[in-house]
């Protein structure tokens, strides 16, 4: 991996003091590009690039001194600072795009047609896997904006895919208190500070402080990151949380149109059982027995290979 990093940084010119011969290092050029034609608020920019506040402030100050960027309070919220490109900044961004395209062409030009196809395909795989490694899973209060955004997108996709649409009020809606400890929890997946998926756990039949079984709910992945294994990662994380709480079994339900989810569940060891609830949108009910502590690391690796071959992405998993 370190050798790969060295080759890429050298070939891309990332170590040059004047990236693409424009008189500024790669860090400044990247920030200029990320601000984009529409501008961006500083917090979003910092989260997107994973930059330290002090470093980003210095980069923006350097770009502003060159007349490329203007930093000012937002017109809609004076507490929020935004960065926008000046006319010179827009021209510089366009020139960086042109020169980046030229570098890409210079990389591909010496290669044969088959080699080019292999390189582009390999780049896509590396990008997808590196993106997957950057996604973070964290418990989230159902009232948090990230939670509301994820669940809202989840419900909207169900409404678009289900025959006859989807009405949350008919689907055994959860009270927010059902998805926070000790009753349950909600996990939200974030990439560069933005929500890209979620999954919930609700404990049932609690005996002596531990649930006899837990229900997995609201499992969803944003379409732009499907195929990166996030659906299975959320599923395993929820199984582990259920086992840690003392549950012996996890159950879930799903709709017949969500074939991707059904394939994943079966690949991950879920077996179909009779209905355990009266959800009007469910056609299949599944159950899985848990080992104490949840899936072991070796088991997770084997299952990961199996599920990657079985399903390319994870749509909304259940109603």
Task: Explain the meaning of each model-derived region.
Residues 1-26, 146-151:
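N-terminal leader segment of winged-helix/HTH proteins
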Residues 14-55, 60, 66-68, 175-184, ...:
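N-terminal helix-turn-helix DNA-binding core of bacterial DNA-binding proteins
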Residues 39, 75-99:
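Basic, amphipathic "hinge/linker" alpha-helix immediately C-terminal to the N-terminal HTH DNA-binding motif
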Residues 43-44, 213, 235, 241-255:
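Conserved GNAT acetyl-CoA-binding A-motif
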Residues 51, 225, 229-237:
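Conserved acetyl-CoA pyrophosphate-binding loop and the N-cap/start of the following alpha-helix
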Residues 84-87, 121-145, 149, 292-298, ...:
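Conserved N-terminal entry element of GNAT/NAT acetyltransferase domains
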Residues 132, 139-213, 217, 222, ...:
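Acetyl-CoA-dependent GNAT
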Residues 139-143, 248-268, 274-319:
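C-terminal "cap" of GNAT-fold acetyltransferases
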């Amino acid at each position: 991996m370190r050798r790969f990093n060295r080759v890429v940084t050298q070939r891309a010119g990332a170590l040059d003091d004047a990236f693409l011969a424009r008189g500024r290092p790669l860090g400044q050029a990247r920030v200029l590009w990320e601000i984009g034609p529409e501008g961006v608020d500083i917090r979003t920019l910092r989260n997107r690039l994973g930059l330290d506040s002090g470093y980003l402030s210095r980069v923006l100050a350097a770009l502003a001194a060159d007349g490329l960027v203007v930093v000012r309070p937002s017109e809609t919220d004076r507490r929020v600072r935004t960065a926008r490109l000046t006319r010179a900044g827009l021209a510089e961004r366009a020139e960086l795009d042109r020169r980046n395209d030229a570098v890409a062409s210079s990389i591909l030009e010496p290669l044969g047609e088959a080699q080019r196809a292999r390189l582009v395909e390999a780049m896509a795989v590396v990008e997808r896997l590196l993106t997957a490694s950057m996604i973070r899973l964290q418990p989230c209060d159902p009232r948090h904006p990230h939670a509301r955004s994820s669940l809202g997108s989840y419900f909207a996709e169900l409404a678009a895919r289900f025959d006859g649409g989807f009405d949350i009020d008919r689907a055994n809606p959860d009270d927010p208190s059902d998805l926070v400890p000790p009753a349950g929890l909600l996990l939200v997946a974030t990439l560069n500070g933005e929500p890209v998926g979620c999954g919930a756990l609700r404990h049932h039949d609690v005996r002596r402080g531990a649930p006899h079984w837990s229900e997995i709910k609201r499992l969803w992945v944003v379409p732009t990151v499907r195929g990166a294994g996030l659906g299975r990662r959320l599923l395993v994380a929820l199984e582990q949380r259920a086992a840690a709480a003392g549950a012996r079994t996890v159950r879930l339900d799903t709709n017949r149109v969500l074939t991707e989810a059904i394939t994943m569940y079966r690949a991950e060891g879920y077996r179909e059982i009779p209905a355990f609830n009266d959800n009007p949108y469910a056609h299949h009910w599944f159950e899985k027995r848990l080992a104490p502590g949840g899936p072991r690391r070796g088991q997770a690796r084997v299952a990961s290979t199996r599920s990657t071959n079985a399903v390319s992405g994870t749509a909304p998993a259940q109603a």
